[in-house]
Amino acid sequence: MNDELRKRGSGYVRLRQICLVAPHLEPVISDIADIMGLSVCYRDGNVAKYGLENALLPVDTILLEVVAPTQPGTAAGRFLDKTGGRGGYMAIFCCDDPDQRGRHAREIGVRIANVIDHAPYHGVQLHPRDCRAAFIEFNHTEGSDDVLGPYPPAGPDWQKSIAKDVTQALVGVEMQSPEPQGLAEHWGRIIGIPVSKSKTGEPELKLPNGSFQFVRGESEIMSGLTFRVADVAKVRDAAKARGCAVSGDSFDLGGVTFRLAA
């Protein structure tokens, strides 16, 4: 944890959700569900007012969301136009005090883009241009510090949709940048965790339930997700059968590379 947040007595922070964006929900949602053996737990009708539709699938206790624009002029649509459809949209963290983390972000030059207050849920979204690569959101649900506790964005019974026979966990997020060390340090300052090194020597941010690895690439994007699965070959074959571009133990879907690990 960095000094600024340590001084403020900051508590826990965990990866709660990854959000991808696609021009249309289908076939992306059906592909993810079929290939990865996951189930949709919720479709939030409230996002329609933002010109969006969405679906969420639990990967153990982390939620994987896909959003798609339903009308012109949405933030998600602008993101697609800017990136050409490559790159994840949001990294969402649960914590004890989103407002404190929002204040800290402002102090280091990262603007707050949106505050969502739907009791018992409270979220602070940071400006993607200042975050670089993707949106960052911090949120907290009152009375729900348990990883299997209530989480309103995923619906009332999201836990019942957890399926672990094919995909067991989302264990890593890959971030790409021409300056991976600089992006890692920037995200580390925002989130409040120190930069370490991965087994392969890349800058890494370690959370209690996953890690962010930063690799060199032409543009700053969330480029990949790593999943622990029961049978790599079986999932890889399922991706091929759905028409995904497969390379080794990875395939492209929803604007990012899905990497498979045993």
Segments the model singles out, each with a brief description of its role:
Residues 2-8, 14-23, 55-60, 65, 77-172, ...:
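Vicinal oxygen chelate
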Residues 14-15, 19-25, 156-199, 210:
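Surface-exposed interaction/gating patches
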